[in-house]
Amino acid sequence: MHRRATRRPIGASLLPKPFVFDQPLQSEAREAKMEFLRRVVAPWKSELRMNTALDLGCGVGYFSAMLQNAGLQVTAVDGRIENIEEARSRHPGVDFRVADAEDPSLGGLGTFDLVFCFGLLYHLENPFLAVRNLHALTGKVLLLESMVIPEEPPFLIIMDEGPVEDQSLRYISCYPSEGAILKMMYRAGFAHVYRFREMPNHEDYRPAMGRVRRRTVIAASGLALESQLLDVAAEPKLSGDLWNTDPTGIINKLRRFRSKLRRPRTRDRP
């Protein structure tokens, strides 16, 4: 039995249309994100004098078109050629290109006032490489949305990717915690990282009975952003020793006490 490949060639597809991006469940979540973005992008475009945008992991171009309609000159990138071909047919005014988010040569695209990366990071095998690329591409602000695991510390979980062929390039993906995203952003070189006070109005962005919040949106920049929408997010710090099974120190104290009891007593000289 042959072992399956760990990487799908760019452009390889086993899935006919319709695209996952067009499914009804995707539509509901996308509309919530669109409403959220209208509140965010328009003020930034004016206040920060944004003219250009990069949509990394653009799929079939829904958000690329929204950014274009907001008055930005948009370049959009996806790793799967069938997504790009479909996007070009739907939105001919956008510059769509095929590229891998984990490829260091991606920085050759230049810098963009707004870098937009929604729903991509957790599909990647090496998300930190992608975050480094995002930093190199960001001229003013990075706006990133991702699924997150329910952990506060900067942890990642390696998972098998499902058989959805228009979503990722590899069979292995890394799901980060929100803390991991913040940590990667700071270590990639962003001076300022922010959480949003209000998330998109969709169940994935809020906890419910029997379920924790699934997704988050983070902003990062070399500039200090002043906005009522944002709260500063500090770089997470791991405290203590992860390998320590005695955080209170009680076991070590007992060991020292037992050691003292075992020592032979010395008699005082007369």
Predicted regions and their residues:
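Conserved S-adenosyl-L-methionine
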Residues: 190-202
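Short proline/glycine-enriched turn/loop segments at secondary-structure junctions
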Residues: 203-210
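Acceptor-substrate binding/catalytic loop of class I
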Residues: 164-179
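A conserved beta-strand element that flanks and buttresses the S-adenosyl-L-methionine
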Residues: 116
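Hydrophobic adenine-recognition pocket in adenosine-nucleotide-binding enzymes
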Residues: 120
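Conserved class I S-adenosyl-L-methionine
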Residues: 144-166
